[in-house]
Amino acid sequence: MKPLKILISNDDGVFAEGIRTLATSAASRGHKVTVVCPDQERSATGHGLTLHSPIRAEKADELFGGGIKAWGCTGTPADCVKLALNELLDQKPDLILSGINHGPNLGTDIFCSGTVAAALEGTLDGIPSIAVSVASFQWKNFSFAGKLSLDIAEKAIQQNWPKNLLLNLNIPPCEEKEMGDLVWTRLSIRQYEEQFIRRVDPRGNTYFWMAGEAVTDLQSAGEGPKGWPSDVSQIAICSPSLTPIQPDLFWRGNLDDLPNLI
């Protein structure tokens, strides 16, 4: 296919292995790649925007090489994509990829996901966009995730990407030979047991660390074909999960319009 102009962002920051793998994978296929992402870890920032302080962008080409242009920005993931589209890029991209995230973005986790928010900025601007995550914080082999996300993107673009469709791809932490087939999935509802750790600083002021653990994964948020499994259940059986969402969160369009990816 003709080389694509691809914008890549994330919420793990410019030094994360996932985004470097994704950018290198895209460039190796001949695509023109630009990276605009946070200059440090900004996970779980959701769709937050920076309105009360300046956003600074510093060139970071040397972190990627291979002709990839890159910036590290002081803003949120959503800030980064907005800045790229309105100031840093000479041309509108054909595709936006967000990730590869270090950790899952499953079910209702997408509400607080900076990875999904960055991709959603592209969807809101009419650009085909995919959020890509490896469903483990410890897994460090991102090569298959990079390959699969680009295979999906290229195939979907060739089939005329439907308006308002955002694809949320989660890949299980296992070797490719052990992995099941990619399938369409529905969003799970993830319920957490929230925990706050109370501490006191050297000046006697109380502060808190928030932690939470998923204690219940309901089968589905109730939208989509009933024959589709939930995204959480797919990852649990070591199979990649591909969930179509849109700005009001679930794809409610004509199912015949979905790209033929499975």
Swiss-Prot record:
Cofactor: a divalent metal cation
InterPro entries from the UniProt entry: SurE, SurE-like_Pase/nucleotidase, SurE-like_sf
A GO-annotated cellular component: cytoplasm
Main location: cytoplasm
EC number: 3.1.3.5
One Gene Ontology MF term: metal ion binding
Binding site for a divalent metal cation: D11, D12, S43, N101
Keywords recorded for this protein, A-Z: Cytoplasm, Hydrolase, Metal-binding, Nucleotide-binding
A Pfam family assignment: SurE
Cofactor binding note of this UniProt entry: Binds 1 divalent metal cation per subunit.
Location of the protein in the cell: Cytoplasm
Catalytic activity: a ribonucleoside 5'-phosphate + H2O = a ribonucleoside + phosphate
Record family assignment: Belongs to the SurE nucleotidase family.
UniProt function note: Nucleotidase that shows phosphatase activity on nucleoside 5'-monophosphates.
Protein's recorded name: 5'-nucleotidase SurE
Organism: Prochlorococcus marinus (strain NATL1A)
Gene behind this protein: surE
